[in-house]
Amino acid sequence: MPVTDSIADYITRLRNAGRAKNKTTDIPYSKLRENISQLLLEKGYIKGFTVITTEKFPFIRVEMKYTAAGVPSIKEITRVSRPGRRMYEGKDIKKYLGGLGLYIISTSKGVITDKEAREQGVGGEILFRIY
């Protein structure tokens, strides 16, 4: 079944895997999803990911990260810019939760966090926020 909003599908799969305490979750592959996974890995929200190519279709296997008490490291993940209402921000991007959380932004320089966008002086489409 075709998905109209691939980013919303991606974050929903991560959210559901965390709530179900799954070790891994499989997500259909796209270059944007791979870039987002790399960013989440660098920021410590996921344990790791691998791109798996099969005869039918490629997918990304994301390893979920949990605390010692079994609490998911992704406490909240919410889509901001949607297909029906795109949200763009200039180079003066505000901090999410006073800097405790992150906005993930698609810019001309790739997919980066709000902090990196402020440092580089670029704006873009706010894909989602994560805490």
Curated annotation (Swiss-Prot):
It comes from the Bacteria. The keyword Metal-binding does not apply. One of its GO terms (molecular function) is structural constituent of ribosome. Keywords: Ribonucleoprotein, Ribosomal protein, RNA-binding, rRNA-binding. GO terms for biological process: translation. GO terms for cellular component: ribonucleoprotein complex; ribosome. The keyword Ribonucleoprotein applies. InterPro entries: Ribosomal_uS8, Ribosomal_uS8_CS, Ribosomal_uS8_sf. One of the primary rRNA binding proteins, it binds directly to 16S rRNA central domain where it helps coordinate assembly of the platform of the 30S subunit. Belongs to the universal ribosomal protein uS8 family. Part of the 30S ribosomal subunit. Contacts proteins S5 and S12. This is Small ribosomal subunit protein uS8.
